[in-house]
Amino acid sequence: MIQLWGDSRLRSKNDTILKAIKGESTSHTPVWFMRQAGRSQPEYRKLKEKYSLFEITHQPELCAYVTHLPVDNYQTDAAVLYKDIMTPLKPIGVDVEIKSGIGPVISNPIQTVKDVERLSQIDPKRDVPYVLDTIKLLTEEKLNVPLIGFTGAPFTLASYMIEGGPSKNYNFTKAMMYRDEETWFALMNHLVDISIDYVVAQVEAGAEIIQIFDSWVGALNVKDYRYYIKPAMNKLISGIKAYYDVPIILFGVGASHLINEWNDLPIDVLGLDWRTTIKQADKMGVNKAIQGNLDPSILLAPWDVIESRLKDILNQGLNRGKYIFNLGHGVFPEVKPETLRKVTEFVHNYTAK
């Protein structure tokens, strides 16, 4: 295992977020926004008039530009690589496309263990060189904040692959778990294997933090999570850490009932959505760094409302330490860029030491 937290590997001048994760003293609370690269930026919307999401991510210069924009425009303390959690699925044989207004749509959903056996492994240098080239390009451009790479969690990826797209109830996914454990665990193991290779390649290319998005896992109860999901998550996170001791953030939506399960995992940061306060997480015994958790909808409110909510969350974060400010989900397209800029400035000033 290679230690990435030391000065010898640290490329970023602004290492505030890395210090916060470790519980070290920082000059201010670090800020970044999920989906900060993309939808709310006018420059990005102009690009989208010409290119699809996958077309942008396949062109390292464009992708690096989109990734870098919020760091320049909002002065965030981290950059998050612009790509989709579906990115590693196409190379392994999943026919996926992103449809406007719908999201990922998969034409060959997984139904049997034979479908899983037909999936290939991933060779990131061969299959997703554009992702690695984008990371290297950002590093060469001397990005002055840590770059966050990411992957989808096995359950969330599997739910898309089984349902064929977004779902409200995950009926097909749960049905497979309950009636066909052979196929379910084969799929989990395959997704863990490709995700480890995919994440390790991102770290080797220059990513300094990894976020695992388990967007839909809140659909499961605790008992099912422990049996059907948690072993795969342990294997994924431990597998990454066997190569590099890179900081790992875990985030999901509507999953407050799983906080204790997440706290058991070898992650470094637990991402909260807006439904659970930092105080509540602390009372539940969370001993990781915490990230979150302003309701994204608040950013559409008048500034006095935003400021009031910011103060409440920031005070909780300041009281506990080991805290990163973020939203409780991704930035909405309707949010004005100047609002994000103002939020970052407020967080930096309000928490300045």
Curated annotation (Swiss-Prot):
<comment type="pathway">
    <text>Porphyrin-containing compound metabolism; protoporphyrin-IX biosynthesis; coproporphyrinogen-III from 5-aminolevulinate: step 4/4.</text>
</comment>
<protein>
    <recommendedName>
        <fullName>Uroporphyrinogen decarboxylase</fullName>
        <ecNumber>4.1.1.37</ecNumber>
    </recommendedName>
</protein>
<dbReference type="GO" id="GO:0004853">
    <property type="term" value="F:uroporphyrinogen decarboxylase activity"/>
</dbReference>
<dbReference type="InterPro" id="IPR000257">
    <property type="entry name" value="Uroporphyrinogen_deCOase"/>
</dbReference>
<feature type="binding site">
    <location>
        <position position="329"/>
    </location>
    <ligand>
        <name>substrate</name>
    </ligand>
</feature>
<dbReference type="InterPro" id="IPR006361">
    <property type="entry name" value="Uroporphyrinogen_deCO2ase_HemE"/>
</dbReference>
<keyword id="KW-0210">Decarboxylase</keyword>
<comment type="similarity">
    <text>Belongs to the uroporphyrinogen decarboxylase family.</text>
</comment>
<feature type="binding site">
    <location>
        <begin position="35"/>
        <end position="39"/>
    </location>
    <ligand>
        <name>substrate</name>
    </ligand>
</feature>
<comment type="subunit">
    <text>Homodimer.</text>
</comment>
<dbReference type="GO" id="GO:0005829">
    <property type="term" value="C:cytosol"/>
</dbReference>
<feature type="site" description="Transition state stabilizer">
    <location>
        <position position="84"/>
    </location>
</feature>
<keyword id="KW-0627">Porphyrin biosynthesis</keyword>
<feature type="binding site">
    <location>
        <position position="160"/>
    </location>
    <ligand>
        <name>substrate</name>
    </ligand>
</feature>
<feature type="binding site">
    <location>
        <position position="215"/>
    </location>
    <ligand>
        <name>substrate</name>
    </ligand>
</feature>
<comment type="function">
    <text>Catalyzes the decarboxylation of four acetate groups of uroporphyrinogen-III to yield coproporphyrinogen-III.</text>
</comment>
<dbReference type="Pfam" id="PF01208">
    <property type="entry name" value="URO-D"/>
</dbReference>
<keyword id="KW-0963">Cytoplasm</keyword>
<dbReference type="GO" id="GO:0006782">
    <property type="term" value="P:protoporphyrinogen IX biosynthetic process"/>
</dbReference>
<keyword id="KW-0456">Lyase</keyword>
<dbReference type="InterPro" id="IPR038071">
    <property type="entry name" value="UROD/MetE-like_sf"/>
</dbReference>
<feature type="binding site">
    <location>
        <position position="54"/>
    </location>
    <ligand>
        <name>substrate</name>
    </ligand>
</feature>
<feature type="binding site">
    <location>
        <position position="84"/>
    </location>
    <ligand>
        <name>substrate</name>
    </ligand>
</feature>
